[in-house]
A protein has these predicted regions:
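Short, intrinsically disordered low-complexity segments
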Residues: 35-59
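C-terminal structural segments of small proteins and small subunits
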Residues: 53-91
Length: 91
């Protein structure tokens, strides 16, 4: 399954941990957004890992957007063709 994952984490340290966890499962696209092609069990493993890293009571959030094959082919992009390599951006 193809999943776009975005996150909003206020704490720099937790944000870095979320970034590292996601980097093991997908491609970093921009700041707090990853694209992942995962099997169902990989998704459950990632979701469990992220659930243990975030602090929802401190307004941390992670969103998962599931794209079907047809929808995936309709993704359009303007600019930003270079894929990011590594490293978290802290704003």
């Amino acid at each position: 399954m193809f999943i776009v994952i975005s996150y909003d984490i206020k704490d720099d340290r937790r944000r870095g941990r979320i970034f590292k966890a996601l980097k093991n499962f997908g491609q970093w696209m921009q700041y707090s957004v990853f694209e992942c092609e995962l099997e169902k069990m990989q998704f459950f493993k990632l979701k469990d890992r992220l659930d243990h890293l975030i602090e929802a009571d401190k307004d941390d959030s992670v969103r998962f957007y599931f794209l079907c094959e047809s929808c995936k082919r309709q993704v359009e992009r303007i600019g930003g063709e270079k894929q990011r390599k590594e490293g978290a951006v802290i704003v």
